[in-house]
């Protein structure tokens, strides 16, 4: 911000901020005077020293309206400058904004521009940092003008000379010194900042730019081009920031009226020499204060010390120059001055940083004051402390309403004190503010009455740290309570993630009218019932409330009054109060309204009415069928008393899941007000009946099933069988491990199911443990398994922090917690439990950092327009596999989106949703149930084409209000919160399982999902006999081809219902054309290894398989069986030698039919020369299955890896074209894979030896198919399949981690917002005639604008007889040249020859979120994120302008954010009345908006 002499800082309305390098003139213009002395304050008077670092004359008075000497006191002398001490009479606040300066004796280089990477000064002068350093620190001279002596000696400009060389020339050519400095014949060489200043001043940037562009075009050397490009970037930055500003032309002179004379321009902006400082600015003294401590000492800011060093050295140097000290001494002093200024600007970069005397820590320089969490940006500008706030412990307030909170009186009186004082004075209870304060301190009873009136209708904000999403701050209506703890409504705990074990919360008071309106309309807790991350309700009853509702609505056979018929609901309640009917009794009630129920009510009549009352039975059945009588329980009638009429009668057992669905349904049907009322009612009912039920658990409630012993015996027998197989040599160690783990996993699940069933049947389902579990109040099946079944397998904690899963210990814990564990079992289980606790603390920080990066990358994504008009969309298909494996349903993916094209039911050929329509919850549910709709094209943020922000049609509905998103919604921040919040939650929840392993049982059988007809596609199978476990020989069909497919088709329509990929080596159980029923086994496969099978009969022949070289033989000491495993053979051979282990199938004559390469780690199953039948296993490649589930420790690093777009550790090699695979030559460390297509295009890939190749000779592959195993790199997907594919890949992969690892629901649109930001940039390939540079990383929008700018321009090839201002090779507007040509033709002169201007080309770039946040268009936002000094240096050099478009930069400069109610279009709103009489107008910028928002 600019202050000029005598003015105050700009406080007015500004819309953008420009960054540039400060010129000496601008530093002087900001300054109020020169600081000449290093002193701060006088040690006796404690008053600032004149001309010192705290001088009142320069920086302003230390006391309001009082000069230094005391001649002028009081405000009436405002603005007078004292004639005695020279201090202006004004407020002391000016000491926060007035600056001073230090005039340096010699120019000094600014360390930021010299030490930044790449060095800005180095790039302009074409000098390395090392050479620059030697010049700047007075080690060598640099030639500025070689002159005549230089020519004779062969010295050029920019050459470095040592002291000896310099003095040799000086003494040799003595008369040279007599020449003028600007004489071209004079030899001039200098050192230090002065030399750099002179060199920079003499640069011709335009000439350098032309030469560098020439190198770029013509040079063949890649290195030269890279260097030229690096330099050109800096040169162009200076040229762009130093553009002429055209003045208004008074009158034209000269013969050519169209010629522009150079005087008509003023140049402003950066000059290279500004990077060398002649004047150092001194920041205001209040920003580097001196604070008196007790004991008469002072604590000072480090900056004062650093400034002192500069002033002392500068004054000493001036004195030395005056007394004409020897050059050696001067040079040393100049170097010390340079170092002092370096330390002032950036002390942390230096190896020999200036340290403090006592504690020996480096002093904090100006750079350190900006950087990091404690720096100016993050500490003071983004996070401020707030007045009118307090904090206290929270306790539960069960009798509060949803929008209320209990505020302790002592806290309220403190927070609302000014308002109370005002009321007391207004009412005349107190005479003055002072007496009102006394009344408050005495706690006079009248004060409480006034306080009650003051807080009426005034909301307060409650916040619990950490505030991970927007529901972490909500508004409540305070009610005054005794005590010192804040009371919180139990239903808002989930949103705050609060519990009552000592948590604290902060209270804030919104002061202005606008803030109060926003708090009550937008932030009130009863308006925030839905989670923005998934659209699901967040105010869901839990624990006691759920238990109470469950107990109330549960039926018990044989309760008092069972089978009675009641005339009305009221009658039921009377009967219950009179104890004629029990709470759980099943009864009949006359009711003909809407009913939501699960069970078949007619069937219940036979159970409830005795056989002898046959007529009554028949009558009741007919009444029930006519929907006139309802079968329900007394408890359900009581529960439904609180139900809104519109919803009808809920005749279900209410558990947590049902309650959640019910609340979601209510909020969409009847709105927030009634839903909030209902929530308060069921809260009371829940707590009430939990108390009446009196549920508690004892040891006897945990029942261990008797069958447990039998199951464990079976498991022990099965695992012994596996060990026997292993001993026989038919299984590898890896397979043995996997199978044993499977056996125990199955047993554990079996015992768990039986113990669960046992609990369910105990006491008619009224076992307290079972009720807690079944209602969803507390506990999980997993915990019941550990309590009453067996603890099962335990995960061994992982050793690395990189997120690889730990192994499962194959010996399970057979005991459960009721029986008690043995010492060994206890030891094993402590292993996992401790890991959970340590993980929590380590990973919370990681999750928090992820959230911060997400916020930074997406903070400027705001809904700016209604419709961008794009025709593109996202293609979504129904995927049965994902839906059955518990992933996101088709319905969830399309819900709340706008259809990009008509969604059609292909069976009936009718349009279900028209293009441009919103797919509501009802429409989405209908589409889910309609098999005719297989796919849909929806509008998405990923394809939105708006230039700034996004459009509301592409985003779809706002999940928390189920309406199309409004203009100004900060969807980027909501996306970041929605992804970051569960990440943090997940890491905090790992230890609840107690470390028990939950990995999936490896599924070997694939079953039919639909009934239909089998169609086999590319499935080649052979008959193969195998010996089963029982020793019986069986014939099976084994698939010997890769990538075969099995389709299930509808026999009537021929439509494919489901596709399955049949793996290589699978046993197939069905034939082509066979009809199958649902759940019939189609094929089974071995999940633990990849098999290599013989496809034809013949004999095995080993090629390059040599014992001790390419394979090792391991003999099992117990079994004597030898296992052959291929090993990494490279270390065993000389550099020239190479091997490629493979097994060939040969005919009897020895002719090779087919060869199979065998990768490292594979186990051989045949001997050399063995006879083979089709389907025989030649070798197996073991797979590592990730079995440890339920722990996001593995998930969080994965999410980070995806968001940072990192290349995986061992990526797959991916084919870039469609074609056929062939293998080329083999080198020592790699082999060649070629992919060739029918058009003659060929790509060659080199695969490291030992990596498993998935493709075989002759395989057909598609572009993007992996040729080797490993994870596919997102960068490869972008390069080969384009931006759309990589966007879909990232969204799906991240979604998988959250879904599978943690069961957290996040709507796709949030992930899409982040992924969109990762693909915002393009890299320029060819710059064409635009002002871009090749290799530039720029915004897509900037790139399009640059191309549009040259679209209508032409380049002049031959100027013909054009006026002098038309130059060859330059760009001009087409219409101007056409006009000139017309005139030239008229005058029979030769015309101008032109060609169209070339446009730039580019390719999209995928950036990780950290890089994307640093590459943001906003300088302020990037600087506050990371690498502050680098960002500011680059911005200053390029003269960047921050347009303040995002949220962060506006918060930093103290403006309203351009989102929500702070949108610019709302700023000028005024409320006015149409009534004729006068009304008070609320002068507000956001009263109207708050209503518009709602």
UniProtKB/Swiss-Prot annotation:
It comes from Chlorobaculum parvum (strain DSM 263 / NCIMB 8327) (Chlorobium vibrioforme subsp. thiosulfatophilum). InterPro entries: DNA-dir_RpoC_beta_prime, DNA-dir_RpoC_beta_prime_bact, RNA_pol_asu, RNA_pol_N, RNA_pol_Rpb1_1, RNA_pol_Rpb1_3, RNA_pol_Rpb1_3_sf, RNA_pol_Rpb1_4. Its cofactor is Mg(2+); Zn(2+). The RNAP catalytic core consists of 2 alpha, 1 beta, 1 beta' and 1 omega subunit. When a sigma factor is associated with the core the holoenzyme is formed, which can initiate transcription. Gene3D superfamilies: 1.10.132.30, 1.10.150.390, 1.10.1790.20, 1.10.40.90, 2.40.40.20, 2.40.50.100, RNA polymerase II, clamp domain (4.10.860.120), RNA polymerase Rpb1, domain 3 (1.10.274.100). It catalyses: RNA(n) + a ribonucleoside 5'-triphosphate = RNA(n+1) + diphosphate. Mg(2+) binds at residues 499, 501, 503. GO terms for molecular function: DNA binding; DNA-directed RNA polymerase activity; magnesium ion binding; zinc ion binding. Zn(2+) 2 binds at residues 868, 944, 951, 954. Zn(2+) 1 binds at residues 67, 69, 82, 85. It holds the Pfam family RNA_pol_Rpb1_5. GO terms for cellular component: DNA-directed RNA polymerase complex. SMART domains: RPOLA_N (SM00663). The lineage of its organism: Bacteria, Pseudomonadati, Chlorobiota, Chlorobiia, Chlorobiales. This is DNA-directed RNA polymerase subunit beta'. One of its GO terms (biological process) is DNA-templated transcription.
């Amino acid at each position: 911000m600019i202050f000029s002499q005598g003015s105050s800082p700009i406080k007015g309305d500004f819309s953008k901020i420009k960054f540039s390098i400060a010129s000496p003139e601008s530093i002087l213009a900001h300054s109020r005077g020169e600081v000449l002395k290093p002193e701060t304050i006088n040690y006796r008077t404690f008053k600032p020293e004149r001309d010192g670092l705290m001088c009142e004359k320069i920086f302003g008075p230390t006391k309001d309206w009082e000069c230094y000497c005391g001649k002028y006191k009081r405000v009436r002398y405002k603005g007078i400058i004292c004639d005695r001490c020279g201090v202006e009479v004004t407020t002391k606040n000016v000491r926060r904004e007035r600056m001073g300066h230090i005039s340096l004796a010699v120019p000094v280089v600014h360390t930021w521009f010299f030490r930044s990477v790449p060095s800005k000064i180095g790039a302009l002068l074409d000098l390395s940092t090392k050479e620059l350093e030697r010049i700047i620190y007075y080690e060598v001279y640099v030639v500025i003008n070689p002159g005549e002596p230089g020519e004779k000696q062969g010295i050029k400009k920019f050459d470095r000379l040592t002291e000896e060389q310099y003095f040799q020339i000086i003494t040799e050519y003595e008369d040279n010194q007599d020449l003028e400095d600007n004489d071209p014949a004079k030899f001039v060489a200098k050192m230090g900042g002065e030399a750099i200043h002179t060199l920079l001043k003499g640069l011709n940037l335009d000439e350098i730019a032309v030469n560098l562009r020439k190198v770029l075009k013509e040079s063949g050397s890649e290195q030269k081009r890279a260097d030229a490009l690096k330099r050109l970037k800096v040169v162009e930055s200076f040229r762009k920031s130093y553009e002429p500003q055209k003045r208004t032309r008074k009158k034209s002179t000269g013969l050519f009226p169209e010629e522009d004379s150079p005087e008509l321009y003023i140049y402003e902006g950066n000059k290279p020499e500004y990077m060398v400082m002649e004047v150092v600015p001194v920041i205001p003294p209040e920003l580097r204060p001196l604070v008196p401590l007790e004991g008469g000492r002072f604590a000072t800011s480090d900056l004062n010390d650093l400034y002192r060093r500069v002033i002392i050295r500068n004054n000493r140097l001036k004195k030395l120059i005056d007394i004409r000290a020897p050059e050696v001494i001067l040079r040393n002093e100049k170097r010390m001055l340079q170092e002092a200024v370096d330390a002032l600007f950036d002390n942390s970069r230096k190896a020999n940083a200036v340290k403090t005397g006592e504690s020996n820590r480096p002093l904090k320089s100006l750079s350190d004051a900006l950087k990091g969490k404690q720096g100016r940006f993050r500490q003071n500008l983004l996070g401020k402390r707030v007045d009118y706030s307090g904090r206290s412990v929270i306790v539960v307030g069960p009798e509060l309403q949803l929008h209320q909170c209990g505020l302790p009186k002592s806290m309220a009186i403190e927070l609302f004190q000014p308002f109370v004082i005002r009321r007391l004075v207004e009412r005349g209870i107190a005479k003055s503010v002072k007496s009102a304060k006394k009344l408050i301190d005495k706690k006079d009873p009248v004060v409480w009455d006034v306080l009650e009136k003051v807080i009426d209708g005034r909301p307060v904000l409650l916040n619990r740290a950490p505030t991970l999403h927007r529901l972490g701050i909500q508004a409540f209506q305070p009610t005054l309570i005794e005590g010192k703890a804040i009371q919180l409504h139990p239903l808002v705990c989930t949103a705050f993630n609060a519990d009552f074990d000592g948590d604290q919360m902060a209270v804030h008071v919104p002061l202005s009218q606008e803030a109060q309106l926003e708090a009550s309309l937008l932030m009130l807790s009863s308006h925030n019932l839905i989670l923005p991350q998934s659209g699901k309700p967040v105010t869901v009853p839990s624990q006691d409330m759920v238990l109470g509702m469950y107990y109330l609505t549960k039926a018990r056979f044989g309760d008092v009054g069972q089978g009675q018929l009641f005339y009305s609901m009221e009658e039921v309640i009377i009967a219950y109060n009179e104890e004629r009917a029990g709470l759980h009794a099943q009864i009949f009630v006359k009711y003909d309204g809407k009913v939501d129920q699960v069970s078949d009510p007619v069937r219940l009549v036979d159970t409830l009415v005795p056989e002898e009352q046959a007529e009554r039975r028949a009558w009741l059945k007919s009444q029930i069928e006519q929907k006139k009588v309802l079968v329900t329980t007394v408890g359900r009638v009581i529960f439904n008393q609180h139900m809104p009429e519109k919803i009808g009668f809920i005749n279900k057992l209410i558990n947590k899941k049902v309650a959640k669905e019910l609340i979601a349904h209510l909020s969409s049907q009847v709105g927030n007000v009634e839903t909030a009322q209902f929530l308060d009612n069921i809260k009371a009912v829940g707590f009430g009946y939990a108390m009446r039920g009196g549920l508690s658990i004892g040891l006897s409630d945990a029942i261990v099933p008797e069958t447990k012993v039998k199951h464990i015996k079976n498991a022990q027998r099965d695992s012994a069988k596996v060990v026997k197989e292993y001993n026989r040599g038919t299984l590898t160690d890896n397979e043995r491990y996997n199978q044993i783990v499977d056996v125990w996993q199955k047993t554990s699940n079996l015992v768990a199911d039986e113990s669960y069933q046992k609990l369910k049947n105990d006491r008619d389902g009224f076992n307290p443990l079972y009720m807690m579990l079944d209602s969803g109040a507390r506990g999980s099946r997993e915990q019941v398994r550990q309590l009453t079944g067996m603890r099962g397998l335990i995960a061994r904690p992982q050793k690395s922090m990189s997120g690889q899963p730990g192994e499962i210990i194959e010996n399970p814990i057979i005991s459960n917690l009721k029986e008690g564990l043995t010492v060994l079992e206890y030891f094993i289980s402590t292993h996992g439990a401790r890991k959970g606790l340590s993980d929590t603390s380590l990973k919370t920080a990681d999750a928090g950092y992820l959230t911060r990066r997400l916020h930074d990358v997406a903070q400027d994504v705001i809904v700016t327009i209604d419709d961008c008009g794009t025709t593109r969309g996202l293609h979504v298909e129904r995927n049965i596999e994902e839906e059955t494996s518990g992933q996101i349903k088709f319905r969830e993916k399309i819900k709340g989106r706008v259809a990009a094209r008509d969604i059609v039911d292909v069976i009936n050929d009718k349009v279900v949703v028209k293009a441009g329509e919103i797919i509501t919850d009802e429409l989405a549910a209908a589409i889910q149930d309609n098999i005719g709709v297989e796919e849909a094209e929806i509008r998405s943020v990923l394809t939105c084409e708006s230039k700034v922000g996004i459009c509301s049609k592409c985003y779809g509905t706002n999940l928390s209000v189920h309406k199309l998103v409004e203009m100004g919604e900060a969807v980027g921040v909501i996306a970041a919160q929605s992804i970051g919040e569960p990440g943090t939650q997940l890491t905090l929840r790992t230890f609840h399982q107690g470390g028990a392993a939950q990995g999936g049982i490896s599924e070997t059988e694939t079953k039919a999902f639909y009934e239909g007809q089998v169609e086999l596609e590319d499935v080649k199978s052979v008959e193969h006999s195998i010996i089963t476990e029982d020793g019986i020989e069986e014939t099976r069909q084994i698939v010997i081809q890769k990538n075969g497919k099995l389709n299930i088709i509808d026999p009537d329509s021929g439509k494919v219902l489901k596709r399955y990929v049949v793996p290589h080596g699978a046993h197939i159980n069905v034939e082509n054309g066979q009809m199958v029923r649902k759940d019939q086994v189609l094929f089974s496969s071995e999940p633990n290894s990849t098999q290599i099978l013989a496809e034809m009969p013949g004999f095995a022949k080993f090629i390059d398989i040599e014992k001790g070289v390419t394979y090792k033989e391991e003999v099992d000491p117990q079994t004597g069986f030898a296992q052959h495993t291929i090993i990494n053979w490279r270390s065993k051979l000389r550099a020239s030698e190479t091997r490629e282990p493979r097994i060939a199938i040969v005919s009897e004559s020895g002719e090779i039919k087919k060869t199979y390469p065998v990768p490292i780690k594979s186990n051989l199953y045949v001997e050399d020369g063995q006879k083979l039948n089709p389907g025989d296993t030649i070798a197996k490649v073991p797979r590592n299955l990730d079995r440890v589930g339920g722990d996001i420790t593995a998930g969080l690093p994965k999410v980070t890896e995806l968001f940072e777009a990192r290349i995986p550790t061992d990526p797959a090699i991916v084919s870039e074209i469609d074609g056929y695979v062939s293998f080329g030559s083999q080198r020592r460390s790699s082999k060649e894979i070629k992919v060739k297509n029918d058009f003659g295009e060929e790509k060659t890939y080199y695969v490291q030896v030992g990596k498993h190749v998935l493709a075989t000779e002759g395989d057909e592959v598609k572009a993007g198919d992996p040729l080797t195993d490993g994870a596919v790199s997102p960068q490869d997907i972008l390069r080969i399949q384009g931006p759309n594919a990589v966007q879909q890949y990232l969204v799906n992969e991240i979604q998988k981690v959250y879904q599978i690892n943690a069961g957290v629901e996040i709507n796709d649109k949030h992930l899409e917002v982040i992924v969109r930001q990762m693909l915002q940039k393009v890299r320029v390939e060819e710059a064409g005639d635009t002002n871009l540079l090749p290799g530039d990383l720029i915004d897509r929008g900037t790139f399009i604008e640059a191309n549009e700018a040259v679209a209508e321009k032409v380049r002049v090839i031959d100027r013909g007889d054009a006026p002098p201002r038309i130059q060859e090779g330059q760009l001009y507007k087409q219409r101007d040249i056409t006009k000139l040509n017309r005139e030239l033709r008229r005058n029979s002169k030769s015309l101008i020859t032109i060609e169209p201007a070339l446009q730039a080309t580019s390719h999209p770039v995928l950036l990780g979120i950290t890089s994307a946040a640093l590459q943001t268009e906003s300088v302020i936002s990037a600087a506050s994120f990371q690498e502050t000094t680098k960002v500011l240096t680059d911005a200053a050099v390029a003269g960047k302008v921050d347009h303040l478009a995002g949220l962060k930069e506006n918060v930093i400069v103290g403006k309203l954010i351009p989102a929500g109610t702070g949108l610019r279009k709302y700023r000028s709103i005024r409320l006015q009345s149409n009534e004729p009489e006068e009304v008070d107008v609320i002068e507000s910028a956001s009263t109207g908006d708050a209503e518009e928002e709602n």
